[in-house]
């Protein structure tokens, strides 16, 4: 067998390995959170769009929820507006909220729609305000004063969290053969517009859709143990123990909280994986070895 023939055979074997997954999940929904950091790399954005179009081509219905923190920060800097963060969340006054909506819904969303179109797919860009997709309420956070131990309410401005997801607009888009691309903006019953953490938004949508998978693409290879090894499978109970003993800390905590909420509210499973790895999502789902950390509900 020639080298060329061996290469072609290897490609065929990859497809055969993936066949059971294609069959099992045809017609199911994958919700994918794509971070704003990755969008700054055209090659990575192109590969991500190709992965999404491939999922659609094999009968899976992807729904993309994107972030945009770096792009919002860059625009605020250009406009001379200073950014303030509390616990990793941007304090969002009225002016900042308007800039965030402009960047998320008007720039990033349409850029991602364009990448998918270039890869041969048909995408429809929306925000959580369109079709009353996501109703939000003001996010309330508290902090404890280290000296007095008195809890204080943090006012984050127009930062929200989802209270209700109406999937009608997503169902309509999917039925029409489209790939929904969602900006993390929601409308409050109070008439205000709220900026929502993209992980949280993706988790709420995955739960409402009863998605087969929620993928959170991050800048780490998954959930790591104290020795730096990858934890490939976790349940909510195991996650709680790892948080208590300090194995899970920092920015990974809210991501896993999102995963736990999603799998306990209707999503079949969630995956935290390294979005910097080319085609990481396909490696996780369509190969036996997988990639990243899979979270399933407790039995």
UniProtKB/Swiss-Prot annotation:
GO biological process: arginine biosynthetic process via ornithine; L-arginine biosynthetic process
Reactions performed catalytically: N-acetyl-L-glutamate + ATP = N-acetyl-L-glutamyl 5-phosphate + ADP
A GO term for molecular function: acetylglutamate kinase activity
Annotated pathway: Amino-acid biosynthesis; L-arginine biosynthesis; N(2)-acetyl-L-ornithine from L-glutamate: step 2/4
Superkingdom as given in the UniProt entry: Bacteria
EC number(s) from the headed UniProt entry: 2.7.2.8
Residues annotated as site: Transition state stabilizer: 33, 255
Keywords from the UniProt entry: Amino-acid biosynthesis, Arginine biosynthesis, ATP-binding, Cytoplasm, Kinase, Nucleotide-binding, Transferase
Example of a GO cellular component annotation carried by this entry: cytoplasm
Binding positions for substrate per the UniProt entry: 68-69, 90, 195
Subcellular location: Cytoplasm
Described function: Catalyzes the ATP-dependent phosphorylation of N-acetyl-L-glutamate.
Record-stated family: Belongs to the acetylglutamate kinase family. ArgB subfamily.
Alphabetical list of NCBIfam families matching this protein: argB
Listed name of the protein: Acetylglutamate kinase
Gene name tied to this protein: argB
């Amino acid at each position: 067998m020639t080298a060329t023939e061996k290469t072609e055979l290897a490609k065929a074997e990859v497809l055969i390995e993936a066949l059971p997954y294609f069959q099992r999940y045809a017609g199911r929904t994958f919700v994918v959170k794509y971070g704003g950091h990755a969008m700054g790399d055209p090659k990575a954005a192109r590969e991500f769009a190709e992965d999404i179009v491939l999922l659609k081509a094999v009968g899976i219905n992807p729904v993309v929820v994107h972030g945009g923190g770096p792009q919002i920060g860059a625009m605020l800097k250009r406009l001379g507006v200073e950014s303030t963060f509390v616990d990793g969340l941007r304090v969002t006054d009225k002016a900042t909220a308007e800039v965030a909506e402009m960047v998320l819904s008007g720039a990033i969303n349409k850029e991602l729609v364009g990448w998918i179109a270039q890869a041969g797919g048909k995408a429809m860009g929306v925000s959580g305000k369109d079709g009353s997709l996501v109703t939000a309420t003001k996010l309330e956070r508290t902090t404890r004063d280290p000296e007095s131990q008195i809890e204080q309410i943090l006012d984050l401005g127009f930062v929200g969290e989802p209270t209700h997801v109406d999937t009608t607009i997503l169902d309509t888009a999917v039925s029409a053969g489209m790939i929904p691309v969602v900006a993390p903006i929601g409308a409050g019953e109070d008439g205000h517009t709220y900026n929502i953490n993209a992980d949280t938004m993706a988790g709420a949508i995955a739960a409402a859709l009863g998605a087969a998978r929620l993928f959170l693409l991050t800048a780490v290879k998954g959930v790591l143990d104290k020795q730096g090894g990858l934890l490939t499978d976790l349940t909510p109970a195991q996650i709680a123990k790892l948080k208590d003993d300090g194995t899970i800390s920092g920015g990974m905590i809210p991501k896993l909280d999102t995963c736990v909420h999603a799998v306990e509210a209707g999503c079949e499973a969630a995956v935290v994986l390294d979005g910097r790895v080319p085609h990481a999502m396909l490696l996780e789902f369509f190969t036996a070895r997988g990639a990243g950390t899979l979270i399933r509900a407790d039995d």
